[in-house]
A protein has these predicted regions:
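Hydrophobic alpha-helical membrane segments
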Residues: 1-214
Length: 214
């Protein structure tokens, strides 16, 4: 496993020459999910005489579109594997090819995280990091789904949760910059963070394979 600086340097190297497309991909992602949040969190009247809130429907749509979130995440993993090739924005929508497995696995992941958060915040955060490799596992292990994929993520992250947390914490400066720039910085922070996560996963996978070989 690499150190924090190593993952950040590798992320920047992987995104060199691709920051523009990465920002465009992030903007598309924000527009899709941000638009849904605005439309359904604040409520859209069905008729002039009906002001019923559509929050439940909005939540359902968020779940239905979860493969896009999966695709956005794995797009950066595929990017580091491709090397010098252009960032493939189409990867963001590939989750719909394996729709049920991805959607239901992430639904379970979200439910488990929420239940832990309802108990205590810190255990919830710990579990969130335990489950953080699930989407990558869904990509690399097509036969795994639901609890099996989540459990494999938990096994891979055993002893590494703090490392990933500290990696995320080290990017707080970027987060502050995103706030100062009225959110513009997030167009670059998200690709940077997810690319660092992708490198982290690749090292976890290599470590797992080495342990199996031994």
């Amino acid at each position: 496993m690499d150190n924090i600086s190593g993952y950040k340097d590798r992320a920047i190297e992987s995104l060199t020459g691709k920051w523009g497309n990465s920002a465009i991909a992030t903007l598309i992602y924000i527009i899709i999910f941000g638009g849904i949040a605005i439309a359904f969190s604040y409520g859209v009247p069905l008729t002039q005489s009906c002001s019923t809130k559509l929050d439940p429907l909005g939540n359902i749509i968020q779940i239905v579109l979860s493969p896009i979130a999966w695709g956005f995440e794995i797009m950066f993993l595929e990017n580091i594997r491709k090397g010098d090739k252009e960032l493939d924005l189409g990867k963001m929508f590939e989750g719909f090819k394996d729709y049920i497995r991805i959607m239901l696995t992430n639904l379970l992941r979200g439910i488990y995280t929420l239940l832990w958060m309802l108990l205590l915040i810190i255990p919830g955060i710990i579990k969130m990091y335990s489950y953080s490799m699930t989407n990558y596992i869904l990509l690399d292990d097509p036969d795994l789904k639901y609890n099996s994929a989540i459990e494999k993520s938990m096994a891979m992250m055993k002893g590494h949760k703090m490392n990933l947390f500290l990696l995320d914490l080290s990017m707080i400066g970027w987060l502050i910059l995103s706030i100062i720039t009225c959110g513009i910085g997030i167009l670059f922070l998200a690709p940077y963070n997810l690319t660092a996560h992708a490198h982290f996963y690749e090292d976890l996978k290599a470590e797992e394979q080495q342990n199996i070989a031994e």
